[in-house]
Amino acid sequence: MKKMKIKPPFFEVGPKAYFCGERAVELGRVAQAASEETGVSVIYTPQLTDLALVSREVKGLYLCAQHMDPIPMGKGQGSILPEAVK
């Protein structure tokens, strides 16, 4: 996993559960454009189910999962493994 080194100033966009799917991608594109225009780094935290989609469609943002569980693979129904959000 690539380590992130974010230098200030930065801005975080956390859409919570207001956007999903293509709307989450659109918001990511707006954040990317703002980052390029201002030179300010943007951390974007879409819903976990949109993380891979946004990663493929939008470049230039620091993407972070909203949540993960610090557990090893195995039992843990409903848990989010660290390996799943790489």
Task: Indicate residue ranges for each PLM-predicted region.
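Conserved N-terminal beta1-alpha1 strand-loop-helix module at the mouth
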Residues: 2-77
